[in-house]
Amino acid sequence: MTFYQLSDAEGADNYYNPLLLWWYDFWVHWVSALFAWKCSSKNILLPFFLSNIGSRHCDVGVGTGYYLSAVRKRQPSWPQDKLTLVDFHIRCLRKAANRVGIADRTECVLANILEPIPIQPERQFDSISLMYVLHCLPGASKDKGRVFANLKPLLKDSGTLFGSTLLCRGVRQNWFNWLLQRIYNAVDMFQNRADFPDDFVRALEEEFEEVESVIIGTVLMFKARKPRR
């Protein structure tokens, strides 16, 4: 496993200790997904992930490696090329890389995606994923849109950028959703009080010729192709 540190991010692990990462999958991908977000990780987001990944993939905001691990179980030969993990948290990178279990083909990049990521153009990817990342970033959705501009140079002309984010605006929330988002925003685990779906879609359309999006429950799912050069 190759490790690159492209930002001084080691101090950003307040909420990403080993115990929380162990608990994360059960709470986020089962309890919260089904009863709060109303968008199943297993039945909706995982098939979405599977349908968009390429042989040379970059996963941004890796969490515990839930989606990557699930892909490996279904497609043991994937990825055919290098797998690149990008995150702002060292523990998440280590957890995800160990869980995927292909150290010889995995590189970890510690970086802040709100800033340009200095990965060389010849290392462009067939696919880039942003699953449940944007709602954790600081700022309003209009500001977070620059993430797409920062990632676009890393994508091949034939590649796909795709992802999902939890919305606090422009969606109907049940009481459980409302309570969780209120708590998570209060402790800065989420920062999506000023996130609007239209802002994300507009930002994608500025950077890509083809953009698709859909809201399921309180989750915005999006994918973009044909990066504007």
From Swiss-Prot:
Citreoviridin inhibits mitochondrial oxidative phosphorylation by binding to the beta-subunit of F1-ATPase. Ectopic mitochondrial ATP synthase is a factor that mediates HIV-1 transfer between antigen-presenting cells (APCs) and CD4+ target cells, and citreoviridin can completely block antigen-presenting cell (APC)-mediated transfer of HIV-1 at the APC-target cells. Inhibition of Ectopic mitochondrial ATP synthase by citreoviridin can also lead to suppression of cancer growth by activating the unfolded protein response. InterPro entries: Methyltransf_12, MeTrfase_VrtF, SAM-dependent_MTases_sf. Pathway: Mycotoxin biosynthesis. Its EC number is 2.1.1.-. One of its GO terms (biological process) is methylation. GO terms for molecular function: methyltransferase activity. Keywords: Methyltransferase, Transferase. Belongs to the methyltransferase superfamily. Methyltransferase; part of the gene cluster that mediates the biosynthesis of citreoviridin, an inhibitor of the of F1-ATPase beta-subunit. The HR-PKS ctvA accepts acetyl-CoA as the starter unit and catalyzes eight iterations of malonyl-CoA extension and four iterations of SAM-dependent methylation at C4, C12, C14, and C16. The KR and DH domains selectively act on the first six iterations to generate the hexaene chain. This is Methyltransferase ctvB.
